[in-house]
């Protein structure tokens, strides 16, 4: 959704100017959770027959000052433009841009057995040195089929230091030699 991406980009710019990048991030995802789980909000938000002024007033009462004025103004703008549906997309575009700015990277760590925080700290230092990853968010998965070692997946990069990966590489080389 191009419109949702534009709203997210505008919020990022505003968040940078106002020093509220993280506040906007938290509140947008809070908003997403409300949309998923709160029937009262959904009844108000997705009622296209309700007058815009009434909807704005009810949204303001619903949040009762627990929301940043810029986010509230975004909600008002979406109501005015009759673009309520795109509120569900804005947080994800915002997160994508926000993560790039602050250096957050989701790193899938595949290991043959559980690892401790000391190993994750070493991986974190290595990622910073080798790839400039400042804030890795580790998603650890245990996969006994890799036999040993470790496999990292992030930003379309695969670092395979597993025993299975090494054996697969050797097998490919042997097949090449056998074909020649």
From Swiss-Prot:
Subcellular location as annotated: Cell membrane
Record keywords: ATP synthesis, Cell membrane, CF(1), Hydrogen ion transport, Ion transport, Membrane, Transport
Top-level taxonomic group: Bacteria
InterPro entries linked to this entry: ATP_synth_OSCP/delta_N_sf, ATPase_OSCP/dsu
Quaternary structure note: F-type ATPases have 2 components, F(1) - the catalytic core - and F(0) - the membrane proton channel. F(1) has five subunits: alpha(3), beta(3), gamma(1), delta(1), epsilon(1). F(0) has three main subunits: a(1), b(2) and c(10-14). The alpha and beta chains form an alternating ring which encloses part of the gamma chain. F(1) is attached to F(0) by a central stalk formed by the gamma and epsilon chains, while a peripheral stalk is formed by the delta and b chains.
Record's function text: F(1)F(0) ATP synthase produces ATP from ADP in the presence of a proton or sodium gradient. F-type ATPases consist of two structural domains, F(1) containing the extramembraneous catalytic core and F(0) containing the membrane proton channel, linked together by a central stalk and a peripheral stalk. During catalysis, ATP synthesis in the catalytic domain of F(1) is coupled via a rotary mechanism of the central stalk subunits to proton translocation.
Name of the protein in question: ATP synthase subunit delta
Gene: atpH
């Amino acid at each position: 959704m191009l419109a949702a991406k534009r709203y997210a980009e505008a919020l990022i710019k505003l968040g940078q100017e106002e020093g509220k990048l993280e506040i906007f991030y938290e509140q947008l995802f809070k908003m997403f959770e409300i949309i998923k789980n709160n029937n009262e909000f959904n009844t108000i938000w997705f009622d296209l027959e309700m007058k815009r002024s009434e909807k704005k007033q009810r949204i303001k009462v619903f949040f009762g000052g627990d929301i940043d004025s810029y986010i509230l103004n975004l909600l008002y703008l979406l109501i005015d433009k009759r673009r309520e549906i795109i509120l569900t997309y804005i947080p994800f575009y915002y997160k994508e841009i926000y993560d790039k700015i602050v250096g957050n990277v989701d790193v899938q760590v595949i290991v043959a057995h559980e690892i401790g925080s000391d190993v994750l700290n070493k991986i974190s230092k290595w990622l910073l040195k080798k790839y400039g990853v400042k804030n890795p968010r580790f998603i650890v998965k245990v996969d006994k089929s890799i036999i040993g070692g470790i496999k990292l997946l992030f930003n379309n990069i695969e670092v395979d230091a597993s025993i299975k990966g090494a054996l697969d590489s050797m097998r490919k080389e042997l097949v090449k030699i056998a074909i020649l």
